[in-house]
């Protein structure tokens, strides 16, 4: 390996794709070449949503350790439940390693039909973590569809109905973008492929 190749490798930002319920890691590995072409070093991290042997905190700490052991800047894309894990990872990032977070069709409100205790705990933790994330300068964007039978677009928006704030203010560093898609799985697939350029641009743009 030449010095130039080493320089490029070291300076290539890491992108961690975090799947939602089901942890279909192999599906996300299929889109890694697309994100590599956009200038990222892609990783797929299976959170373990269906793993009953470990509790939520062990899973979240495992993600935190994975991020901490990477060299260089880190960007996160969380699909569905994976978006909650991504934002909780940002809350745990005390060294400002994470430079951008995008969530796709992510539920910020827990509904019983989702039927996953790990996700319920993760959303509860997110409610506690979000106010403290206001001071961070990380760019965060929530992408959602026109219609989603699993996670309604309104559940992909953080407001005072789902997260209580004493000053009745909005979360200033979280942006929202609607994708012209229908359906939960299709929105995630389109976000990682067809609209990948749009999401990439949002990830790397400076916070407003």
Which role fits each region the language model picked out?
Residues 15-17, 26, 35-45, 55-143, ...:
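Serine-dependent carboxylesterase/thioesterase catalytic core
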Residues 1-13:
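Short beta-strand-to-loop junctions in surface cap/lid or active-site-entrance loops
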Residues 22-30:
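Serine-hydrolase catalytic-loop signature spanning alpha/beta hydrolases and amidase-signature enzymes
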Residues 46-48, 178:
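Residue-level recognition of beta-strand->loop/alpha-helix junctions
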Residues 135-208:
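C-terminal catalytic-base region of ester-bond hydrolases, centering on the histidine
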